[in-house]
């Protein structure tokens, strides 16, 4: 087929890799919601979803059908355009954040030299979705939830970014593939242990997951910024939250635990196993920790996480300068 030039083949392969990887991410996010409900039932000594299909295996299909057929209701005095745009931005930004994660050698949607900066930019874009949802709903609980979420996310993104600077300094690159290759002998979690701890805490907070789910606190805010959403608009917020968990888990693996590297098994299998482990940690955290007050969450971030990241960065810089002499 002479019309298939090498450039066209390269473009088609890139599109194929992007479609496969992003479909897998969406599927993992959807199945994590089912697995979380089953595991929470086990932890709380009750049954999880077990009626639809064998052992509840078709619960996701039932939920999807329900979402499609629920009324797509928009509040009377809301800003209809922004109200509709918010869940799309939330879903798309969190999905695109995964594009810079290499799942195995050569399998990455966008192998950018500024990969970490791209991730931070997408994480910052998700804040706009929350603000748009809260403001456009014309609901006081939505607005309060959006204000909480934006303040919490912007604060913890500072710690998230600073915790990555030590990894960048050690690898000498913002490229995710270069960072994975730099861990061929020692995983970054050993020299960057405090950076990993801060990144994990900030990652949970940025995803608005328990115990940092104050923006969605049912007892105080009646489900927060997406209280007025229903149908597939709510579904986009819901799936987007789990895609964020998959992305943060994959970044923990890539930045601190050697990415796809491991003995005996294929690289993709190692990456999937490590990522699944951290996804499980999100569920265990939700099952075991109480929700603190909002002021305690913000105080913890600025008084503990920020000094910890700065100390980690200063020590890393000092060690690199000492080794260069």
From Swiss-Prot:
BP-aspect Gene Ontology terms: aerobic respiration
Top-level taxon of origin: Bacteria
Membrane-traversing stretches: 11-31, 81-101, 114-134, 154-174, 186-206, 237-257, 265-285, 304-324
This enzyme's EC code(s): 7.1.1.-
Similarity field: Belongs to the complex I subunit 1 family.
Family matches, as NCBIfam families: PRK06076.1-1 (NF004740), PRK06076.1-2 (NF004741)
Protein name, per record: NADH-quinone oxidoreductase subunit H
UniProt source species: Escherichia fergusonii (strain ATCC 35469 / DSM 13698 / CCUG 18766 / IAM 14443 / JCM 21226 / LMG 7866 / NBRC 102419 / NCTC 12128 / CDC 0568-73)
């Amino acid at each position: 087929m002479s019309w298939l030039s090498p450039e066209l083949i390269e473009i088609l392969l890139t599109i194929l890799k992007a479609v496969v990887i992003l479909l897998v991410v969406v599927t993992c996010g959807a199945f994590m919601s089912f697995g979380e409900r089953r595991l929470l039932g086990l932890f709380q000594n009750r049954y999880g979803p077990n009626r639809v299909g064998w052992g509840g295996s078709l619960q996701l299909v039932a939920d999807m059908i329900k979402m499609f057929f629920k009324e797509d209701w928009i509040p009377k005095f809301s800003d209809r355009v922004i109200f509709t745009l918010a869940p799309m931005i939330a879903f798309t930004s969190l999905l695109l954040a995964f594009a810079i994660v290499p799942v195995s050698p050569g399998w990455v949607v966008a192998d950018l030299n500024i990969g970490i900066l791209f991730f931070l930019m997408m994480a910052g874009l998700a804040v706009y979705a929350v603000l748009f949802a809260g403001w456009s709903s014309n609901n006081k609980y939505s607005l309060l939830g959006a204000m909480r979420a934006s303040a919490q996310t912007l604060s913890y993104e500072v710690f998230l970014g600073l915790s990555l600077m030590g990894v960048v300094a050690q690898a000498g690159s913002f490229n995710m593939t270069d960072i994975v290759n730099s861990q061929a002998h020692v995983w970054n979690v050993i020299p960057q242990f405090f950076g990993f701890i801060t990144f994990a805490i900030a990652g949970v907070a940025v995803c608005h997951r328990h115990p940092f789910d104050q923006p969605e606190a049912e007892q105080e805010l009646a489900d927060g910024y997406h209280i007025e959403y229903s149908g597939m608009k709510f579904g986009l917020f819901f799936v987007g939250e789990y895609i964020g968990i998959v992305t943060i888990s994959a970044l923990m693996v890539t930045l601190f635990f050697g990415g796809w590297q491991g003995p005996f098994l294929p690289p993709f299998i190692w990456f999937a196993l490590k990522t699944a482990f951290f996804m499980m940690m999100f569920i265990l955290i939700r099952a075991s920790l109480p929700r603190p007050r909002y002021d305690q969450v913000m105080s913890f971030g600025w008084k503990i996480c920020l000094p910890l990241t700065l100390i980690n960065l200063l020590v890393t810089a000092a060690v690199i300068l000492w080794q260069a002499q």
